[in-house]
């Protein structure tokens, strides 16, 4: 039954049978994620909710919309992908997120947070116009309710009364910040005269009871607080049901039946346990959110820790070192304190470093205001999430030339998370903005120098980028040097052709340089360093070389080679330039080395391409 491509085979009246299905799903998730890595604890925690959804609804008539969709593994297993699930996050295998091109049962692409309700509103509007039966059903995590788009969608949904079911999966992972902030806003309701008077009267009554039952006084206030979120949603015109036990299938089924009958917008508040069913992961929220391969029995990682610091660690260590000396340094991250390395700074200086939750636009705008007040804000953010704050960069930082510092992590190809998470766009869109300074380090040592430069640069916004995992260039190959605004660095002068690397592209170019040397072809190597402004001496630097080859981890359109070609055109210089950047397509998931090879960006393919361009055979 469960292995078939039919969701209606799940009998909502057979709770015991559904519980067995849940156990089967959990076992399969654990088996595959322990081997491949992936988003474990959120997927384990959402199993009963997803089984309940499939038991009651046909997801092709009632589109299931998974917010972020990293918790949708059970959905994949229930929709014909039980066996192929072994290829999860592997090159040319199943995506770790919902993906319509993978399955007709995946309604919408997902990967970024907080979009599900907005998508659902669009579906509901379309269904109303087409007079289509059915309603969208969105499963969203607690972290997603901190983003503005969630409230924008609720605003219209409550006003228009479109039929829609929202299931808020409250696993107390991301909810600590957003619900904490929401609770503060909602606490005004609890400070009102009704609540205060009612509480006072009940406490007075309870105080007359024997001490053995006086514990009810404290339980009363806790229970009354549960009403508050409901009041908030009801005031917006959204029916609220909950909180319910998100692991009790009987309760889930009955609640979904009720929500289905209402034919109005409904939010079901379900409380779940992240990592449910795997004792080692239960309650250890952040550690088991996203994992690499691990031993099922011990929970220990199968990968040994690298002796070399990751770029993220090199960045955060350097920023911490500077923050100890400079009280003007502050920092912001948008719900990624651990991923960006800002967690250690938040722990050390909680009044100066902030996790603002999933609110990238707010992160950039508030940082711009801090810069105006004389502080030095470092915004630590993944490349893929920075694009969510583009207007804030333009409107709030760059127009006024406020010196925020964008530390762009996960730049380039990121591997198993795929097209929704690749860090390939930042170069193209940032270089189009006036007043923005853009530069990139080539290794951990120059990354430290990049942080130093950003800290001292006070005349405009600046941005520097670095990759996930490690740089392509090994430590110590070239002596590190400090950054000087608009200056490149010629690492090797000899040769008839010039390899130009930007950021992590320097390491890629260096590997090609070594491969070509084995073919008796000497190549010069330039670390471009600054993309904006370009080195004003670039025309003199490139003059001795017959051809230029450009290496960088970003899209070719509007990328590094484009900037160089624009410069050459303005200088009336004719020089052959070939770009080894990313072509105009969304890049799929998989092991980074395999993905790069498929794109012709591995050392062997790049070497062959240059040999061919030079008219030589390998």
Swiss-Prot record:
This is 1-deoxy-D-xylulose-5-phosphate synthase. Mg(2+) binds at residues 142, 171. One of its GO terms (cellular component) is cytosol. InterPro entries: Dxylulose-5-P_synthase (IPR005477), THDP-binding (IPR029061), Transketo_C/PFOR_II (IPR009014), Transketolase-like_Pyr-bd (IPR005475), Transketolase_BS (IPR020826), Transketolase_C (IPR033248), Transketolase_CS (IPR049557). It catalyses: D-glyceraldehyde 3-phosphate + pyruvate + H(+) = 1-deoxy-D-xylulose 5-phosphate + CO2. Homodimer. It holds the Pfam family DXP_synthase_N. SUPFAM superfamilies: Thiamin diphosphate-binding fold (THDP-binding), TK C-terminal domain-like. CDD domains: TPP_DXS (cd02007), TPP_PYR_DXS_TK_like (cd07033). Binds 1 Mg(2+) ion per subunit.
């Amino acid at each position: 039954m469960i292995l078939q491509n039919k969701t209606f085979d799940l009998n909502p009246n057979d709770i015991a049978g559904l519980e067995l299905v849940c156990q089967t799903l959990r076992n399969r998730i654990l088996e595959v994620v322990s081997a491949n890595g992936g988003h474990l604890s959120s997927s384990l925690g959402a199993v009963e909710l997803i089984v309940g959804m499939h038991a009651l609804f046909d997801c092709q008539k009632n589109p299931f919309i998974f917010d972020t969709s990293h918790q949708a593994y059970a959905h994949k297993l229930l929709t014909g992908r039980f066996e192929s699930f072994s290829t999860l996050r592997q090159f040319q295998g199943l995506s770790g997120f919902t993906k319509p091109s993978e399955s007709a049962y995946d309604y919408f692409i997902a990967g970024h947070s907080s979009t599900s309700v907005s998508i659902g509103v669009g579906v509901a509007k379309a269904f109303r116009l087409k007079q289509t039966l059915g309603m969208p059903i969105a499963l969203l995590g607690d972290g997603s309710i901190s983003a503005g788009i969630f409230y924008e969608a609720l605003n219209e949904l409550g006003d228009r009364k479109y039929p829609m079911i929202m299931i808020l999966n409250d696993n107390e992972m991301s909810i600590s910040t957003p619900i904490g902030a929401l609770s503060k806003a909602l606490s005004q309701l609890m400070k009102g005269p009704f609540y205060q008077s009612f509480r006072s009267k009940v406490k007075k009554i309870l105080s007359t009871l024997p001490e053995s039952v006086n514990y009810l006084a404290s339980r009363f206030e806790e229970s009354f607080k549960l009403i508050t979120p409901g009041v908030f949603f009801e005031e917006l015109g959204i029916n609220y049901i909950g909180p319910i036990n998100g692991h009790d299938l009987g309760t889930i089924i009955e609640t979904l039946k009720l929500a289905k009958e209402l034919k109005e917008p409904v939010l079901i508040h379900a409380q779940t346990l992240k990592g449910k069913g795997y004792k080692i992961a239960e309650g250890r929220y952040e550690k088991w959110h996203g994992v690499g391969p691990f031993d099922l029995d011990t929970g220990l990682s199968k990968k040994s820790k690298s002796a070399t610091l990751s770029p993220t660690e090199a960045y955060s260590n350097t920023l911490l070192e500077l923050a100890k000396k400079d009280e003007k340094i502050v920092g912001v991250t948008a719900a990624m304190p651990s991923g960006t390395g800002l967690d250690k700074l938040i722990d050390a200086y909680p009044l100066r470093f902030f996790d603002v939750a999933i609110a990238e636009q707010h992160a950039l705008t508030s940082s711009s205001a801090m810069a105006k007040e004389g502080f030095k804000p470092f915004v630590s953010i993944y490349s893929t999430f920075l694009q969510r704050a583009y207007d804030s960069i333009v409107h709030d930082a760059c127009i006024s030339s406020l010196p925020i510092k964008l530390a762009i992590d996960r730049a380039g190809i990121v591997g198993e998370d795929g097209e929704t998470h690749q860090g390939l766009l930042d170069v193209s869109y940032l270089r189009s903005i006036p007043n923005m300074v853009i530069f990139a380090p080539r290794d951990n040592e120059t990354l430290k120098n990049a942080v130093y430069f950003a800290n001292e640069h006070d005349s405009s916004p600046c941005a520097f980028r670095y990759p996930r995992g490690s740089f392509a260039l090994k430590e110590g190959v070239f002596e590190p040097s400090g950054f000087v605004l608009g200056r490149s660095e010629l690492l090797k002068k000899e040769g008839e052709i010039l390899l130009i690397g930007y950021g992590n592209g320097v390491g890629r170019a260096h590997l090609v340089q070594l491969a070509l040397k084995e073919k008796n072809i000497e190549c010069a190597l330039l670390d471009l360093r600054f993309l904006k402004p370009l080195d004003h001496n670039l025309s003199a630097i490139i003059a001795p070389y017959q051809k230029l080859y450009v290496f960088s981890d970003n899209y070719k359109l509007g990328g590094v080679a484009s900037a160089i070609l624009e410069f050459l055109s303005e200088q009336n210089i004719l020089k052959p330039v070939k770009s080894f950047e990313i072509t105009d397509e969304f890049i799929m998931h998989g092991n980074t080395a395999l993905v790069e090879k498929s794109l012709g960006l591995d050392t062997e393919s790049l070497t062959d391409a240059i040999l061919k361009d030079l008219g030589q055979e390998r």
